[in-house]
Amino acid sequence: MCRLTLAQQPDTTFDQMITKIAAGSHRILSVSFYARRTLTVARDLLGKHLVREISGTTRAGRIIEVEAYVGPHDRACHAHKGRTKRTEVLFRSPGVAYVYLIYGMYHCLNVVTERLDYPAAVLIRAVEDETGLIDGPGRVCRAYGIDLTLNYHDLTTGQKLWLEDRGKRPPRSQIGSFPRIGVDYAGEWAARPWRFRIASVRRKTRKAQVTPERKRIFLES
């Protein structure tokens, strides 16, 4: 039995946080899953599956690493300096995708959390699928065909891009917490241990493995 609780709805059960989409154990994470404290959502995303569908082809990977960005007071959060055209999506309802570009070439996928008008999100940093470990937010987006067209996408609809619970959760003892990466500009906030990873999965430096056919489907559609 899962012990997750909603701050807003303390009696909400895990089954009420997810929407059943098939007779099996695959369930799309619903708005209620995301509408909780960001650090809780971040930890609970580990072991869930990122699912991408393009032209009838579906690819799914187990989430291995995430980072939490919590509100306007968090100096590492993009919304720290206020509401702008770029950060407007962070103020939207929980369960929306925030996709942005770094270095002019790498996309990063975040899921918006907590509540309307409160800017918070979780960055998806690594997944593991049939090709192996895909480590790094840019590599994840490249392998799964995620780009700026999916910014503001509703992740709870089960269309194009969504997150699933497939019934397996890593034990708390296997979840490590570490400082976030690439946020040295955030001062003392850079040291917050808000990066979470399934510790049993070792880090690897590798390119996202995409077969020629999969590359054609996911990157050229």
Report each predicted region and the residues it spans:
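Conserved, well-structured core segments that form or line functional sites
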Residues: 14-221
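Cationic, low-complexity basic patches in intrinsically disordered or flexible, solvent-exposed regions
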Residues: 9-10
